[in-house]
Amino acid sequence: MGSFPFLLPFAELEVGQHLYWQLGNIRIHGQVFMTSWLLIGALLTLVVVGTKKMERDPKGVQNLLEFLWDYIRDLARTQIGEKVYRDWMPFIGTLFLFIFVSNWGGALVPWRLIRLPSGELGAPTADINTTVALALLVSLSYFYAGLSNKGLRYFEYYVHPTPIMLPFKIVEDFTKPLSLSFRLFGNILADELVVAVLVFLVPLVLPVPVMFLGLFTSAIQALIFATLAAYYIGEAVEEHH
């Protein structure tokens, strides 16, 4: 690496190192909060710019936002159903955009140039705490969707089509957030580690196509998470006959 000293900040690996903030008796990962709010701020800025002067014939940022709106609307309508999909569009859209921006922000923004006392900045979704929190939000959401639409009839789902399904569906309630959180966390963390190792070993050639592949898989992971969240909500509000 002597010939490429400028690449050293990108090639350092600090797995499991965190910048801790103390809030009372609670320790939180400071770098996750920092990158999350920076990316949320960038996303909000994009929305403000795109909606500041709305035009009948959209172009630029407005055109991008309208494309995203149509895409999220179609996704929610397909997975949740015509009856209640509008109520859940903001939630599904927020999940998709936050995960998408977090994944791409981790891949495209040179966070490692910003030095911290401990740990390093990176994609919020490469931290298991973030993905578990998102998965638990999805679980709470489909419970709420089922109970608010059906009342206590929601629990008929656990014995449909036969009471034999009860233990399996109870276990499923635990496996859903586990699979959501670990799938997203594992894919994003693995992508960051692979790119960092390749930058260290082969700094100029090989990492570039791997980074493009990482951008593609990051977008797919955001889509999978949002689609599964919408599907679980749709499953909760579906009427069983």
From Swiss-Prot:
Cross-referenced PROSITE patterns: ATPASE_A
InterPro entries hit by this protein: ATP_syn_F0_a_bact/chloroplast, ATP_synth_F0_asu, ATP_synth_F0_asu_AS, F0_ATP_A_sf
Cystine bridges: none
Entry-linked SUPFAM superfamilies: F1F0 ATP synthase subunit A
Major localization class: membrane
UniProt keywords, alphabetically: ATP synthesis, CF(0), Hydrogen ion transport, Ion transport, Membrane, Thylakoid, Transmembrane, Transmembrane helix, Transport
Transmembrane segments: 30-50, 91-111, 128-148, 193-213, 214-234
Entry GO CC: plasma membrane-derived thylakoid membrane; proton-transporting ATP synthase complex
An annotated Gene Ontology molecular function: proton-transporting ATP synthase activity, rotational mechanism
Pfam families according to UniProt: ATP-synt_A
Subcellular location: Cellular thylakoid membrane
Gene3D superfamilies referenced in this protein's UniProt entry, alphabetically: ATP synthase, F0 complex, subunit A (1.20.120.220)
Function of the protein: Key component of the proton channel; it plays a direct role in the translocation of protons across the membrane.
Entry-linked HAMAP family: ATP_synth_a_bact (MF_01393)
Subunit structure: F-type ATPases have 2 components, CF(1) - the catalytic core - and CF(0) - the membrane proton channel. CF(1) has five subunits: alpha(3), beta(3), gamma(1), delta(1), epsilon(1). CF(0) has four main subunits: a, b, b' and c.
Protein family according to the UniProt entry: Belongs to the ATPase A chain family.
NCBIfam families in alphabetical order: ATP_synt_6_or_A
Protein name: ATP synthase subunit a
